[in-house]
C-alpha cells in the first residue's frame, strides 16, 4: 500500500487540476463552492434513499390493500424493479460517461417520479393492478440505477486520492442513515 500512496501523490503533484482541495495554513481544505456542492449532494443522496425506501417499505401494504395482492405478488413487482436496476447498472455507467453524471441523475430522478406518478394514475384509471404496471417497475429499476451508479463517483471526485476512503464514508453515512 505505501507504494500505491506514493504513486497517487506523484500523480496528484503532476496533475493539480484533478485536485479540488486547496492548501492552506490549516492543511488541505475544500473551497467554499465545492463544500456547498458536496453538502447539497449528500443531502440529496439522503432524500433519495428516504423516498425510495419509504415507497418500497410500504409497497406491500399498498399492493395488498389497493390491488388485493398477496405478499408474494407484491414482492414480484419489487423483484422486477430490482432486476431492472441490475440490468441497467453497466449501461447507465456507459451513458453517464457520454452525457455526464449530473444529467444521468436528473434523468433518473425524473423517470423515478414519473414512473411512480404513472403507476398511481394507471391504478386509478384501471381500477386496480394491471400487468402493464410491470413495465413501470422495470423503469423504476432503471431510474434507481441512474441515480445510484452516479452518486458515489460524484462524491468521490470532489476529493484528492488520499481522501477517497473519507469521502466514501461520507457517502455511506448519508445513504445508510436514510434507510
Where are these regions (language model features)?
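Cytoplasmic membrane-interface "Motif A"-like loop-to-helix N-cap segments
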Residues: 98-111
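C-terminal ends and interior cores of transmembrane alpha-helices
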Residues: 111-128
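Loop-to-transmembrane helix entry/capping segments in MFS-fold secondary transporters
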Residues: 71-72, 159-171
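Intracellular juxtamembrane helix-capping segments at the cytosolic ends
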Residues: 146-160
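Helix-to-loop junctions at the C-terminal end of transmembrane segments
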Residues: 88-101
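Juxtamembrane intracellular "pre-TM" segments in multi-pass secondary transporters
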Residues: 2-43
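Hydrophobic core of transmembrane alpha-helices in multi-pass small-molecule transporters
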Residues: 130-146
Amino acid at each position: 500500500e505505501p507504494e500505491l500512496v506514493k504513486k497517487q501523490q506523484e500523480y496528484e503533484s503532476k496533475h493539480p487540476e484533478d485536485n479540488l482541495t486547496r492548501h492552506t495554513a490549516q492543511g488541505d481544505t475544500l473551497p467554499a463552492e465545492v463544500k456547498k456542492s458536496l453538502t447539497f449532494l449528500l443531502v440529496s443522496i439522503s432524500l433519495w434513499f428516504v423516498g425510495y425506501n419509504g415507497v418500497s417499505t410500504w409497497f406491500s401494504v399498498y399492493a395488498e390493500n389497493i390491488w388485493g395482492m398477496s405478499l408474494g405478488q407484491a414482492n414480484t413487482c419489487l423483484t422486477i424493479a430490482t432486476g431492472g436496476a441490475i440490468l441497467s447498472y453497466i449501461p447507465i455507467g456507459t451513458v453517464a460517461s457520454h452525457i455526464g453524471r449530473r444529467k444521468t441523475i436528473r434523468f433518473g430522478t425524473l423517470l423515478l417520479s414519473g414512473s411512480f406518478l404513472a403507476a398511481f394514475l394507471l391504478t386509478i384509471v384501471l381500477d386496480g393492478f394491471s400487468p402493464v404496471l410491470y413495465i413501470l417497475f422495470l423503469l423504476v429499476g432503471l431510474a434507481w440505477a441512474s441515480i445510484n451508479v452516479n452518486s458515489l463517483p460524484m462524491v468521490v471526485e470532489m476529493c484528492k486520492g488520499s481522501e477517497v476512503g473519507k469521502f466514501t464514508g461520507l457517502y455511506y453515512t448519508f445513504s445508510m442513515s436514510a434507510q
